[in-house]
Amino acid sequence: MGQKVNPNGFRYGITKPINSVWFAEKQNYGDLLVQDAKIYKFFDKLVRKYQIGNTSIKRTKAQKVTVVLQTSQPAKLLGENGANIEKITQDLHKYLKNKSLDINLQVSLLKQPELNARLAAEAIAQKLENRESFRVAQKLVINDALRAGAKGIKTQVSGRLNGVDMARAEGYSSGEMRLHTLRQDVDFAKATARTIYGAIGVKVWISKGELLEGDK
C-alpha cells in the first residue's frame, strides 16, 4: 500500500534547503534541538500577525544564533527604527529563559506570498474562524495562487464543517500536483482554525513546477 509522506520532509536536502543549519557535538545536540523547536514554536504564533512565510535557523561555532524570517510585510515586522524587532528579540529571550544567548533576527522580503503554502493555509484558517464558507475560503486561495503563477494547488479542510455533528474532510485541487516527483517544487503546510464547533485542520499543497538542474 502507498504511504503518505510529508512533501517537505521528502524533499529536504534534495530540492529544498534545510531550515536548521548547524553542527553540534553529541553532548550538546539534544539541547540545541529542543531550543530550535522552541524558536519555531515562538514564531508560529506570529505568522498571522506579521505574515511570516518561512523561518530558518543558523548557528556558528561561537553559538551565535541567526534566525532568518521571510515575511511579506517587512516594515511591519521591523517597526519604526527597528523597535518592534528588538522587542520580539527580548520576548524570545524570555520565552527561551536564556538572556545570555546571542540571537540575531534577520528579516527578508517574501516575494509572491500567494505561492507560500504556510500563508495560504493560515489565510483559509482565518476565514473559517471568521465564519466564512469553507468552500469559498478554499476557492479564493486557489484562485490567488493560480493568478500568481502556481502550476498546481490542492487544499483540504477537515473537522466539523459548517457545524455538522459528523466530522469530514473536503478539499479542492487545480492544476498539476505530482507529489512523488522530487523534481516537482512542492510547498506544503498545515494550519488549525479554532471555531465555535471545535478545531478544523487545514492543509495546503502548492506546486511551482519542475526544477531544472541548478535551480535548488
UniProtKB/Swiss-Prot annotation:
**Might you report a single GO cellular component term?**
cytosolic small ribosomal subunit
- Protein name, per record: Small ribosomal subunit protein uS3
Keywords for this entry? Ribonucleoprotein, Ribosomal protein, RNA-binding, rRNA-binding
What function does this protein fulfil? Binds the lower part of the 30S subunit head. Binds mRNA in the 70S ribosome, positioning it for translation.
Quaternary structure annotation from Swiss-Prot or TrEMBL: Part of the 30S ribosomal subunit. Forms a tight complex with proteins S10 and S14.
Pfam families under this entry?
KH_2 (PF07650), Ribosomal_S3_C (PF00189)
PROSITE patterns cross-referenced by the UniProt entry: KH_TYPE_2 (PS50823), RIBOSOMAL_S3 (PS00548)
Q: Which gene encodes it?
A: rpsC
Q: Which residues form the KH type-2 domain?
A: 39-111
Lineage, please?
Answer: Bacteria, Bacillati, Mycoplasmatota, Mycoplasmoidales, Metamycoplasmataceae
Q: Which organism is it from?
A: Mycoplasmopsis agalactiae (strain NCTC 10123 / CIP 59.7 / PG2)
Q: Which family does it belong to?
A: Belongs to the universal ribosomal protein uS3 family.
Q: What InterPro entries does UniProt report for this protein, alphabetically? A: KH_dom, KH_dom-like_a/b, KH_dom_type_2, KH_sf_prok-type, Ribosomal_S3_C_sf, Ribosomal_uS3_bac-typ, Ribosomal_uS3_C, Ribosomal_uS3_CS
Q: Name one GO molecular function term.
A: mRNA binding
Name a biological process GO annotation.
Answer: translation
